[in-house]
Amino acid sequence: MSDLEPAKNPEGASHVSVLLGEVVAALASGPGDMVIDGTFGAGGYTRAILATGASVTAFDRDPSVQRFAAEFSATDGRFRLIQDRFSQITEYLEDASVDGVTLDLGVSSMQLDEAERGFSFMRDGPLDMRMGADGPTAADLVNDLDHTELARILYVYGEEHASRRIASFIIKRREERPFTRTLDLAHVIERALGGRKGAKVHPATRSFQGLRIAVNAELDELEAGLLAAERVLKPGGRLAVVTFHSLEDRIVKNFLAERAGRTPGGSRHLPPVEAGAPPSFQLISSKAIAPGEAELAVNPRARSSKLRAAVRTTAPVWSEAS
């Protein structure tokens, strides 16, 4: 863990950025460099990157981060926040113009701690789950989707094997009254799964993950963001991505392996490339970097995190390769 002071959440408790020291090392930024913090949050990565002497352009679609950004804007002219999704980087920055891009994926502990955001199955709040200010809420999905689509979301995005049973319980209950609160939904999921007493993981964990990913189109956003990073990074620029579950990690792993010439890869979101396209990235490490025991002791949230990093080569972006 870095000895840099972590950013603070609204309640004053520390919001500790995961794998902070490892991310800073992977970016290897310094004075004169421009780094993109694609998931600003409470500013933990931004603070550490600024400490290296680099400038930071941060992105975040969550309006609530403005209160953290104001602190940086007031004290450091090397920082700016763009209130948008990280997949939109190319709308604001020129190709091959930045020295580093970092992404810290998924929901933050800050968002989980704020019951009114509707992400938590442990705190009662409106069934929202939106990271931004617009679009359908989790309540919209739970109350409107048919059984097939609801079960698909829980299975594909939540990796919940009891997805059909949970969807059936949800639909039966919503016929009586619509879902509006997080704990209401969590209790129905618990009943569908029989409580799973003694389980270390809450029964609603996977279902809430699936709904959150669907509400925010997180996997589509990730793949679009990786393509954007490939475009805006200079030759020698570095990409560092922290993931928290297998769906995210698989996308990042396959993208970087493919772009480094390690595997054919392939995704419905990525443009087709002819065989023999020159590698656009070189892997910094062939394996993901995991948190050490010291970090896990003080930050349990880091338990499932993985860091993958790579260096941009001089090759063109793959959509332009021939």
Swiss-Prot record:
The UniProt keyword set, sorted, is: Cytoplasm, Methyltransferase, rRNA processing, S-adenosyl-L-methionine, Transferase
* Binding of S-adenosyl-L-methionine, residues: 43-45, 60, 86, 104, 111
Instruction: Give the record's GO biological process terms.
Output: rRNA base methylation
Assigned GO CC terms: cytoplasm
One Pfam annotation reads: Methyltransf_5
Primary residence: cytoplasm
Q: Which reaction does it catalyse?
A: cytidine(1402) in 16S rRNA + S-adenosyl-L-methionine = N(4)-methylcytidine(1402) in 16S rRNA + S-adenosyl-L-homocysteine + H(+)
Kindly indicate where the leader peptide sits in this chain.
none
Q: Which InterPro entries match?
A: RsmH (IPR002903), SAM-dep_MeTrfase_MraW_recog (IPR023397), SAM-dependent_MTases_sf (IPR029063)
Query: What role does it play?
Result: Specifically methylates the N4 position of cytidine in position 1402 (C1402) of 16S rRNA.
Q: What is this protein called?
A: Ribosomal RNA small subunit methyltransferase H
Gene name tied to this protein:
rsmH
